[in-house]
Amino acid sequence: MPDPDGADLQGIERRMYFLTPSPTAGHGQMKSPGPRLAALPGSRPERLSDPRVLREALEATAGAIVNGAEWLASCASVPADVFAAWNGGRLAHVPAGVNWQIVRAIKPLGLDAVVRMCASKHHLGPVLLTMRDGVVEFLVAPGTVDGWDLPGTTVDSLSRTLYCPHPHVVPLRAVEGRTWLVPPDGTGGLTDGDLLYEALAAARAAAAVVGATW
């Protein structure tokens, strides 16, 4: 069933190429269509007319989704509770602080930073969009964001919880207003805190040039 925030997600798709693991691209790089195989700006849907390419894309995507789900569940004290929540169509509650910290950025800054990091071919770990709060959440390695002081962003405390849908929930879908912009692929790869800070700072500076005040 379409999410009530679908219109918002359509706008995001128009701005961003959907980010996902693929046979020809590293995690978070923009080289081939995502799981829905949509013809988004910058994609090459004609390649999918080749049955072999289509099959490889589907197999790689399915494998990454399964691996990402298992990785997230393994970060919880009771992995079965994570899968039970997903099977019930709910958000799973996974503790932060041990395996990652969460950097939260207001949506305009966060989306711009995602685009900038991909354009620079920097690795992106899992990224969530929380539409109801207008926030983008980045998973970063614990201890890599000490002294964070960038306006428009916050670093959650180590005791916070990640509320996340199953990794297959991507635009144009959402669960309780949350969707993955970059779903986990099971490798455990996270966003580098320093590179994320640079991308967010650049996004903020660019916004200031056009008069945005965040």
Where are these regions (language model features)?
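Elongated alpha-helical scaffolds
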Residues: 137-140
